[in-house]
């Protein structure tokens, strides 16, 4: 009866993205102490939509138990080859093999074609046919001793070595995020299809007074990151242009800029390949003529500001048919005036949607805010966390795109 109930791990599936949706990943665990991190890795793969299976060597059980690994992946854990010919069954079923952690022993045997346990036997099934990701973990001396095997494997088709971190005389297993990113890059779903591509402008830009000092603002970048995560979770392809502030997670492509001019140029360059453009960035309205070197602080200084081009205005001028969404931040206005000013911006730049907020109520960096989501046809007031508000914006954008 209990076997018919869905394993709780399955509830995590796709909670971050659909980048690995419908992908089946076989995780092979060998006897490095880094094996204790494997359940975390499995669950991160699942959060991106993957179905995860697991095989282990006999020695692995001295480091981590089968039940812990079953907890991690939500499926049975295999430790030997039986009459069910598990190495063939799992090869046929799975899209790739991920050996995490990979010991010196297992790496050497795979390169030499030795098949004396379920892990290296299964690896030989995948060898040259489907992707194999190898994540070494061992003492640095051992890594150097088997480097010839690693170098040989690197030359093979469809084998990817995810480099360890060399610290304290050890070749420590790569970060889980780096491992998942590598898997996504090689076997992840191509979500970049027409109607599904979102470009987000995020963070606060800076304008240089000299080579050291800048004029900027207090934008945290949290809203843009929350939006990026929310769109990604719903299966959109997302890229972010970030100035100062929080950057998006590892699985979302990020482009770094600093100034308003850089933000504008990068947005114009990238926007041609996107369907939806959202600017939650606090982009400098003014720039200043920058001085060479570092100005002396001994004398008073008068700065002459000049207007920057409006990024949304320029994007709309160039890209007339794209969905463009802006944000409008004001300070200490009553509700009617805030909405009116946001509507003026909406109409002036011919935006599809604008999100307005009053910074006197919730300042830069606050996690809980109150906003007005405004289109040409409706105004919706919503309060909540930036995560909750982002999810609501995504819902409304999905309806907007369909209409």
Curated annotation (Swiss-Prot):
Coiled coil: none
Effect after changing residue 217 to H: Shows only residual PPC synthetase activity
Reaction equations catalysed: N-[(R)-4-phosphopantothenoyl]-L-cysteine + H(+) = (R)-4'-phosphopantetheine + CO2; (R)-4'-phosphopantothenate + L-cysteine + CTP = N-[(R)-4-phosphopantothenoyl]-L-cysteine + CMP + diphosphate + H(+)
GO molecular function: FMN binding; metal ion binding; phosphopantothenate--cysteine ligase activity; phosphopantothenoylcysteine decarboxylase activity
Region described as Phosphopantothenate--cysteine ligase: 198-403
Domain of life: Archaea
UniProt key word Methyltransferase: no
EC number: 4.1.1.36, 6.3.2.5
Effect of residue 168 to A/D/K: Strong decrease in PPC decarboxylase activity
Pathway terms, separated by semicolons: Cofactor biosynthesis; coenzyme A biosynthesis
Region (Phosphopantothenoylcysteine decarboxylase): 1-197
Binding-site residues for CTP, renumbered to this chain: 285, 294, 327
GO terms (BP aspect): coenzyme A biosynthetic process; pantothenate catabolic process
Cofactor remark: Binds 1 FMN per subunit.
GO cellular component: phosphopantothenoylcysteine decarboxylase complex
UniProt keyword list: Decarboxylase, Flavoprotein, FMN, Ligase, Lyase, Magnesium, Metal-binding, Multifunctional enzyme
Cofactor(s) this protein cannot do without: Mg(2+); FMN
Known partners and oligomeric status: Homododecamer. The CoaC domain is responsible for dodecamer formation.
Protein family (similarity comment): In the N-terminal section; belongs to the HFCD (homo-oligomeric flavin containing Cys decarboxylase) superfamily. In the C-terminal section; belongs to the PPC synthetase family.
Its job: Catalyzes two sequential steps in the biosynthesis of coenzyme A. In the first step cysteine is conjugated to 4'-phosphopantothenate to form 4-phosphopantothenoylcysteine. In the second step the latter compound is decarboxylated to form 4'-phosphopantotheine.
Name of the molecule in the record: Coenzyme A biosynthesis bifunctional protein CoaBC
Protein source organism: Methanocaldococcus jannaschii (strain ATCC 43067 / DSM 2661 / JAL-1 / JCM 10045 / NBRC 100440)
Gene: coaBC
């Amino acid at each position: 009866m209990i076997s018919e109930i869905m394993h709780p791990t399955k509830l995590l599936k796709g909670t971050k993205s659909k980048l690995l949706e419908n992908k089946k990943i076989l995780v092979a665990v060998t006897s490095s102490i880094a094996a204790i991190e494997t359940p975390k890795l499995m669950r991160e793969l699942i959060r991106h939509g993957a179905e995860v299976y697991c095989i282990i060597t006999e020695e692995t059980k001295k480091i981590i138990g089968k039940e812990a690994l079953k907890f991690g992946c939500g499926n049975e854990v295999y430790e030997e080859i039986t009459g069910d010919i598990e190495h063939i069954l799992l090869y046929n079923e799975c899209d790739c093999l991920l050996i995490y952690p990979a010991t010196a022993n297992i790496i050497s045997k795979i390169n030499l074609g030795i098949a004396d346990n379920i892990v290296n036997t299964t690896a030989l099934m995948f060898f040259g046919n489907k992707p194999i990701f190898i994540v070494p973990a061992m003492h640095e001396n051992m890594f150097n001793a088997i480097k010839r095997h690693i170098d040989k494997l690197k030359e093979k088709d469809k084998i990817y070595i995810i480099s360890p971190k060399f610290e304290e005389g050890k070749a420590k297993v790569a970060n889980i995020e780096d491992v998942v990113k590598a898997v996504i890059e090689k076997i992840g779903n191509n979500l970049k299809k027409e109607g599904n591509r979102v470009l987000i402008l995020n963070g606060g830009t800076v304008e240089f007074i000299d080579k050291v000092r800048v004029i900027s603002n207090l934008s945290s970048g949290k809203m843009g990151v929350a939006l990026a995560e929310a769109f990604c979770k719903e299966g959109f392809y997302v890229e972010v242009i970030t100035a100062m502030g929080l950057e998006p997670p590892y699985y979302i492509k990020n482009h770094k800029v600093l100034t308003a001019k850089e933000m504008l140029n990068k947005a114009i360059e990238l926007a041609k390949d996107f369907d939806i453009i959202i600017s939650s960035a606090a982009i400098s309205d003014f720039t200043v003529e920058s001085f060479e070197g570092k100005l002396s602080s001994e004398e008073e200084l008068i700065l002459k500001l000049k207007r920057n081009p409006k990024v949304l205005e320029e994007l709309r001028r160039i890209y007339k048919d794209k969905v463009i969404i802006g944000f409008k931040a004001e300070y200490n206005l009553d509700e009617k005036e805030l909405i009116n000013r946001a509507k003026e911006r909406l109409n002036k730049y011919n935006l599809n949607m604008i999100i307005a907020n009053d910074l006197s109520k919730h300042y830069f960096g606050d996690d809980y805010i109150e906003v007005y989501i405004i289109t040409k046809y409706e105004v919706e007031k919503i309060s909540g966390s930036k995560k909750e508000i982002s999810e609501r914006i995504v819902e409304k954008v999905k309806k907007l795109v369909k209409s």
